[in-house]
Amino acid sequence: MRASDLAYETLRDEIIHWTLAPGKVLAEVELSERLGVSRTPVREAIARLVADGLATQQGARATTVSDVSLPEVRHMFELRRLLETAIARAAASADQMHREPFVELAEAFENAARRHTLESEPYYQLVSQLDDRLDQAGQNSYITAAVRNLRIHLQRVRLMAQDDPDRLRASASEHAEIARAVANGDPDVAQAATTLHLHHALRHILDHALTPAFNAAIAADHERTCDRTS
């Protein structure tokens, strides 16, 4: 692996997992020493992070980790809904060969939903398998490219909220409905199930975000809503 790729993947993962917090300055000298590479690969990695939207150029020289605001989260989910419902419809409209794997996936999610204890890491690996199968069955490279870029930010947003066992089981049931609808070749149900899942996923993040700045933004938004309705 090239030094710039290694630096990029390391920094991207640290941003996604909140090891590098929003506003943190990405200083080339400090990072090159910590990562054990020269400044040029670090500079290239930072440029890629800026292009991804995970870092923000502040003036001529300083680059910081991008923040995640309440409007941005809602915009992400608005785009996610458009992309993922389109993928779900396309997958459910695909031929039997492309839809066959969703039978097994639906069963796997149904089994997960019945478990008393559902570990998050294996569960999200199963979700990733479903995403990959939907991308393949949807057979639209442009939508796939767009949603894969968005998933980088969505993973970061998901980690803002602590996993809840009840929510994981509910999410498993929702994913089972999506997979079953695709397996049955029902685009309308696949779209509706995807829309419902995304509504619940966004609600969970808004209700359980752990970052103080984000919680403050949610509280302010709630106060404005109350003012408008009073």
Label each residue range with its predicted role.
Residues 4, 120, 164, 168:
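Flexible, glycine- and charge-enriched loops at secondary-structure boundaries
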Residues 5, 81, 103, 169-173:
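Amphipathic alpha-helical repeat elements characteristic of tetratricopeptide repeat
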Residues 1, 70, 95, 102, ...:
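Short linear sequence motifs
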Residues 51-56, 150-152, 167-169:
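Mobile beta-alpha loop/short-helix "lid" or hinge segments that flank ligand
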